[in-house]
Amino acid sequence: MDFKYDVIVIGAGHAGCEAAAAAANMGSKTCLITMDMNKIGQMSCNPAVGGIAKGQIVREIDALGGYMGLVTDRTAIQFRMLNRSKGPAMWSPRAQCDRGKFIWAWREILENTPNLHIWQDTVEELIVENGEATGVMTCWGVTFHAKCIVLTAGTFLNGLMHIGHKQLAGGRMAEPASYHLTESITRHGITAGRMKTGTPVRIDGRSVHYDLMETQDGENDFHRFSFMSEPRKLKQLQCWTCFTNEEVHEILRKGLPDSPLFNGQIQSIGPRYCPSIETKIVTFPDKPQHQLFLEPEGETTQELYLNGFSSSLPMDIQLAALKKVPAFKDLVVYRPGYAIEYDYFDPTQLKHTLESKIIKNLFLAGQVNGTTGYEEAGGQGIIAGINAHINCHGGEPFTLGRDEAYIGVLIDDLVTKGVDEPYRMFTSRAEYRILLRQDDADMRLTERAYKLGLVKQDRYEHLCSKREAVNQIIDFAKTFSIKAALINDALESLGTARLTHGCKLIDLLNRPQITIENIAGHIPAFKAMLDQITDRKEEVIEAAEVLIKYQGYIDRERMIADKIHRLEAIRIKGKFDYNSLNSLSTEARQKLMKIDPETLAQASRIPGISPSDINVLLVLLGR
């Protein structure tokens, strides 16, 4: 059998789903190949989406016309906005989801996406002709031809799971690994490596003593992941927290000789910011306890996920240690925690479009690029899908800058700096956090995606109405004058200083004690104007208030970003033989030859490139 498509996507995880949907929605005839149609969009580890910096990425995916935010809102069983005590640049949405419903929500979307066909099979070989990816062959002997291939294979490439001394081949528990595909790619010159991740035990909730834990409730305000205001339909559930203790740690320490992480069985590097419980007790031997979070797997299941107890120790040691936690003294588990090693490809071999520099029309996204996390995968997936479509049908490459999106920061870090451990996004990785807030992802990105043809008319009209309402509030605040005598009693009741003379409303709103909501009731004209906003009123008010209170910081950060843009405009790719530039340091020559940066700004971000190296390049360019 022989099939022809514009775009083929290999793997239906979070990167693959977004890539396939983006390419198909833009008009490419697309085929999504997955080993198991019942595992589309599977949450391989914790049943949650979002978190610090990750939540911003999900909102960016949504603003671009992707689906992770919509799927999350439809299947959320608990929502929280993290970092509320900090400024809005740090606010990050997070939701617990129903794992089973999450899969079926994704499948329903994909099965109803025009131009998209799903095929259940395992890809074994990438077909490359004259340096271009032209198709794939599957284990069933089916050949698929395409103009572009997007590889989103997650942890399945030569996946190997570890529980104690026991090793099992597979990409996830009870699921087969993918063989031969890595080798069919590396034979063309692409470099591969190995990484490791892990997951904790899954618990039978009927065996837990909930009265011995602290509850953690969600929030029920207006916040969502999607800007399309998807209502929450599922029952909102609690999470719980508890702690390990010295008895737990002692059992774990005795089991270390049987730990694949410490007996030499696992050589790959795992995620720094999601360490196993055995790594925690070795790295922090003086810490008497570690916090654990018990998270529901769904609305109608007893299965619970134990966040904070990732482990690859033998099953009996995991269980014995957990039973020393009072809430788990009668614990029953569904399956143990395990570690998994898998292949990834050096992301410095990619362009910012996520197309390979070595094999034309081959795109890579997700964990195959050395990242960890559903959100990071989804963000890469939508960019890869967009650019695969553009490669097929023509147009300018679509990339996002570091001042435009966390997705832009993520991809620039990958292709410029590379990875030596699984990469996770944090707000600290972004230079322009106040420009990349979760509340304005639509303002930043939706119009660009609309011009691409990815965002539909209804979403674009949503953006336009929101922008108009936000500007209306800000314009009113800038022009409306307030007399001191009419507002001073209200100001005093709100805990802020009285006025000595009249002022503009915006001057009051810049006070920390004053919000749009608490002052509007004292200014009838302002309240009447706000009452005219009927569509997503709370979201509009929040967006306007952030812009009013933080405008000075926003302007300052934009000015810094604009200065960096001048370096972004200086293109250097193909202009130098770095090896012959003796005025550069040896390290700089080696790094510049490897990365081959597109612009001077990208060169400046390469680890090991000093300001003096950049000055050398500027001089050679005649600047």
From Swiss-Prot:
Residues noted as binding FAD in the record, renumbered to the chain: 11-16, 123, 178, 367
Q: Give residues annotated as binding NAD(+).
A: 270-284
Q: Which UniProt keywords apply?
A: Cytoplasm, FAD, Flavoprotein, NAD, tRNA processing
One MF annotation (Gene Ontology) recorded for this entry: flavin adenine dinucleotide binding
Does NAD show up as a keyword for this record? yes
Q: Which GO cellular component terms are attached?
A: cytosol
What the entry lists under InterPro entries is as follows: FAD/NAD-bd_sf (IPR036188), GIDA_C_N (IPR049312), MnmG (IPR004416), MnmG-rel (IPR002218), MnmG-rel_CS (IPR020595), MnmG_C (IPR026904), MnmG_C_subdom (IPR047001), MnmG_C_subdom_sf (IPR044920)
| Residues making up the signal peptide according to the UniProt record | none
Reported cofactor(s): FAD
| GO biological process, any | tRNA methylation
Q: Where in the cell is it found?
A: Cytoplasm
Q: Does the keyword Disulfide bond apply?
A: no
Q: Which PROSITE patterns match?
A: GIDA_1 (PS01280), GIDA_2 (PS01281)
- NCBIfam families recorded: mnmG_gidA
User: So what does this one do?
Assistant: NAD-binding protein involved in the addition of a carboxymethylaminomethyl (cmnm) group at the wobble position (U34) of certain tRNAs, forming tRNA-cmnm(5)s(2)U34.
Family, per the entry?
Belongs to the MnmG family.
What's the subunit arrangement here?
Answer: Homodimer. Heterotetramer of two MnmE and two MnmG subunits.
UniProt xrefs under PANTHER family: GLUCOSE INHIBITED DIVISION PROTEIN A, PROTEIN MTO1 HOMOLOG, MITOCHONDRIAL
Q: What is this protein called?
A: tRNA uridine 5-carboxymethylaminomethyl modification enzyme MnmG
Biological source species: Phocaeicola vulgatus (strain ATCC 8482 / DSM 1447 / JCM 5826 / CCUG 4940 / NBRC 14291 / NCTC 11154) (Bacteroides vulgatus)
